[in-house]
Amino acid sequence: MIICKTAHEITLMREAGKIVSATLEELKNHIRPGVTTKELDAIAEEVIRSH
């Protein structure tokens, strides 16, 4: 079954996508040997909360 989204829902999805994109871009700058997933989680949380 296909559920149609309202314009507002699409706007929210677009905003969420931008936040995910920004988070992944920031994580890309910090991924290197020796960096733990806990550290990456903290960075991701910081970026997400800043939006």
Swiss-Prot record:
Enzyme Commission no: 3.4.11.18
Cofactor annotation remark: Binds 2 divalent metal cations per subunit. Has a high-affinity and a low affinity metal-binding site. The true nature of the physiological cofactor is under debate. The enzyme is active with cobalt, zinc, manganese or divalent iron ions. Most likely, methionine aminopeptidases function as mononuclear Fe(2+)-metalloproteases under physiological conditions, and the catalytically relevant metal-binding site has been assigned to the histidine-containing high-affinity site.
Cofactor (UniProt): Co(2+); Zn(2+); Mn(2+); Fe(2+)
Recorded superkingdom: Bacteria
Stored Pfam families: Peptidase_M24
Record's keyword terms, sorted: Aminopeptidase, Hydrolase, Metal-binding, Protease
Reaction catalyzed: Release of N-terminal amino acids, preferentially methionine, from peptides and arylamides
InterPro entries: Creatinase/aminopeptidase-like, Pept_M24
Biological processes annotated in GO: proteolysis
Molecular function as annotated in GO: initiator methionyl aminopeptidase activity; metal ion binding
Gene3D superfamilies given in the database record: Creatinase/methionine aminopeptidase superfamily
Functional summary from the UniProt entry: Removes the N-terminal methionine from nascent proteins. The N-terminal methionine is often cleaved when the second residue in the primary sequence is small and uncharged (Met-Ala-, Cys, Gly, Pro, Ser, Thr, or Val). Requires deformylation of the N(alpha)-formylated initiator methionine before it can be hydrolyzed.
Oligomer and partners: Monomer.
Homology family: Belongs to the peptidase M24A family. Methionine aminopeptidase type 1 subfamily.
Name used for this protein in its record: Methionine aminopeptidase
Organism for this UniProt entry: Geobacillus stearothermophilus
